[in-house]
Amino acid sequence: MIDLSTYQSLGDKKNSDFFQEFLPRVYERRVAVGLDEMVGAMAAVVIQVAHGDAVNYMAELAVMGPYRMTDSRLSETHRVFLLCSEPDFPRLIVLEPLSPAYTDEITRWNNLYPLSRANPNARYIGEVYSTKSVAAVRDALEPQNIRFVYPGDQENDFFCREHLTFTFMSDFTYNRVGYVDVDIDDLGALGLTERFTLSPDDEAKISRAAELQAERGIDGLVLGLDHMATRILAGEREDAILEYLTMVPYYFWGAYNISEMNSSTNVTRHPTVDDDKKSPARVFTANNTPSFVNSFDNLPMPTEDFVRNFGRRMHHMAFAVQDGHVATEKNVD
């Protein structure tokens, strides 16, 4: 257990006086309202794919890592797939709109940016954390100006259920945070009671992908999720971190400059898990200078370019890998 009152963050990235003032205050308020007691580890990560893409995506996951589908349900607007790896690791929930014409907040945000318009319904949604009571979490966070989805607010009712609640999309990251107070493996307890099965051809496609992983000798080498990294604008780095730490029981582990990219990597982690794969780190990456300043010195700005082209959003999900030798080649250097 890390003592957040005395912990000194790591790294060479300097933070502002504003950040240094409010970080301990965020920690203190979490304790005062009971958030650190009522919210636990990450239970799931949620991704929406375009209509018709879920099977191909799950096949891709079956080749690349340990996640396999264990349940599939229907909501009024989506097919909902539950994927598991190890019992102690977060689940992966894949949402697929039932209609190619489906439109919601994700569609509208994606259409604002030039390179995300090609797949307007594809987006990383956010993380779901286990809690003792979703109602208690709302009661604790709403006075802090954290906005939650209520019935009728969104086209997709997955974001507002009796035992599952989500925040609105963050103004800084365009991600959500969700909370669940029942077993995440029990989709029926979430009100998703209508089961469906994939066609034999779709099941065969996913099975063949899993077999390919074994044939190539990489099964067992890719472990659970290590971290997920959101790219944000240069001027919103500290705000995004403080907002996230307001909503979840994580801590600011540290931040490092990446001089070659003119950016920084900022890491938040869960203070009590003995393995990050049980509650993966949440990383925020931002340029050190905004786009309109970079041209003075022709500085690199891949992170800023990404955000300007795709919007604030998740950039990658990184899996931990097992060290070892395969086919005479070392797997990890």
Language-model regions, residue ranges each:
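Active-site/pore-lining binding-face segments in mid-to-C-terminal subdomains
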Residues: R308-G311, H315-D333
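Active-site-proximal structural scaffolding
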Residues: A54, P120, L221, R237, ...
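Flexible internal linker/loop segments at domain or repeat junctions
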Residues: S279-G311
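Extended accessory and catalytic-adjacent subdomains in large enzymes
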Residues: Y57, L98, R237, H270, ...
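Vicinal oxygen chelate
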Residues: M1-V39, A43-V49, V63-N119, R123-I232, ...
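Conserved active-site tyrosine of GNAT-family acetyltransferases
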Residues: Y57-A62, L141, I241-V248, N331
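Well-ordered, non-membrane alpha-helical segments in soluble/globular domains
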Residues: A54-Y57, R237-I241, P300, H325, ...
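Beta-propeller domains
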Residues: L225-N287
